[in-house]
Amino acid sequence: APELSDLNVVMSGRGYMPMRLTHWKAEWMQKSGSFDWEYPQWPGMECDGRKWCREELLDFYKPWKEMADAGNIVHIGECGCYNKVSNETALAWYKDFFSVMNELNFGYALWNFRGPFGIAEHGREGTNWEVKNGIKFDKDLYKLFVEGMKK
């Protein structure tokens, strides 16, 4: 929203694009067709008039980057990939998403730490788990998350 750029505010957005990947088979999205969507691939899935990949994520966040370039702080206050897609697909999406956030210098936060969008106990099959203090962590997602915060 360029009309807001001179207000010197923190802008908070969401990190769920493309929704057909991040919310595939999400129960609360069933009326929107989440159970009927084709299985999402990353990169390369086609929806919303785009062939999604890292470059499309950069393009999607271009208006937010313009806000940041105008002197505003941008924070993607919720993001993540629901646990119904394969771990391989989720990790590929997270890798690109985190790298885009890092490149744009945007802060971000996962929807949850522990649970279906989180780093801990999300329940995706094929996960490389590590247990610390009784909590199951996705080692690969944790590594991507930490690397994504580095410049």
Could you say what each language-model-derived stretch is?
Residues S86-K151:
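Aromatic-rich peripheral "rim/lid" segments of glycoside hydrolase catalytic domains that contact
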Residues A1-L104:
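Extracellular glycoside hydrolase catalytic/binding regions
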